[in-house]
Amino acid sequence: MRILVIHQNFPGQFGQLVTAWAKRPGWDVRALGRETAPGLPGYDGLLNYKLARAPHAQQHGYLRQMESATLHGQAAARAMLKLRDHGFKPDVILAHPGWGETLYAKDVFPDARLVHLCEWYYNADGQDLGFDAEFPISFDDRARIRTWNALHTLNLTNCDAAVTPTQWQRSRHPGIFLPKIGVQHEGIDTDGLAPDANAAIRTRSGVVLKAGDPVITYVARNLEPYRGFHVFMRALERLQKQHKKCHAIIVGGDGVSYGKRVRDATNWREKMLAEVKLDPERTHFTGKLPRAQYLKVLQVSAAHVYLTYPFVLSWSLLEAMACGAAIIGSDTEPVREAVTDGETGALVPFFDAARIAEVTAGALEGGSAWAARRLAARQHAQRYSMQAGLAGYDALLSASSPKVGTPIP
């Protein structure tokens, strides 16, 4: 089997898949990523590409992302031509096409089976955009998003099959394309994610927090409204007043992964710290953490708060569940798919800081009900194992079409 894996930030979601495939006898696994892609330790099949130029600053605002996608597609196609000229012709191309890399893949490798990871299809209503009245969208936002969907529509038209991690993400795509889209999560390391009664972590200020301590955890790639950071901070202010011994470990960077940058502060962390009054001795911002330290955070957690707009589900929620954390999640569509209220965690209204604080305080107190939820969360997370993800993607590589609406076997 000859496979070409494409991701702007390779390996992205495909790391564990590439690692497994590259070890198989007779498999030739190559990859494409931007020159800024981190690569995969122990894997030397990555070919980097570089954009010919940046998008023009004078480009129409609605078209800037499309011009960027065209430049990515051009650069990736040139890299694919080099692979072809050196004798590599893939049987399958697996790609995250969200930046435009596969726009011209079929022009280079017309006989390859093109499989797209279709992570998201934007809509101006009914999901992330316009969800939070605190940040209303403009007509220009709506028009820009509609134009940007031209890329995602082309991607769905061009591919032979598509896959998405959750039923919620699949449901966001136009109905005409749903028969093409299967559901399969890539998988998390459930073998390496487990509770640890002896886990401990030392904060930057020197405080040592251990499993069993009243520790609230919050994790996001970046601290921003899409992941409910503003609401969490308001809830934390209430929590610290109610529970005088609780500590909060807040993991995430100060950049923006989704949505817009804050206008009246350097970043969302500074903006929210100016709004709420927190005890700095009990509030621990870690920034982004190495994997081992991140795991310790989940293992010392007495209550893990996960909030998100109706958007892509974070791996961190599933990883917290695999560690047996007590989950307090927003009652939004992607979270409902992973967490059952009263069984594997508690669902709370996204915007209700008072209710979030109340339920989190209950989780800190523990008890038999929360112990049962933690155990059930860990058991449920096994459904998202790396083994299940690999089996599903193996089937997708050779299937004539994905199974619709169910995890790919």
What are the functions of these language-model segments?
Residues 341-342, 346-353, 362-367:
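Conserved acidic donor-binding segment of nucleotide-sugar-dependent glycosyltransferases
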Residues 1-44, 163-165, 408-409:
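N-terminal subdomain of nucleotide-sugar transferases
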Residues 204-227, 233-238, 249:
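Conserved donor-binding/catalytic core segment of Leloir-type glycosyltransferases
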Residues 256, 261-288, 292:
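Nucleotide-activated donor-binding/catalytic signature segment of Leloir-type glycosyltransferases, i.e.
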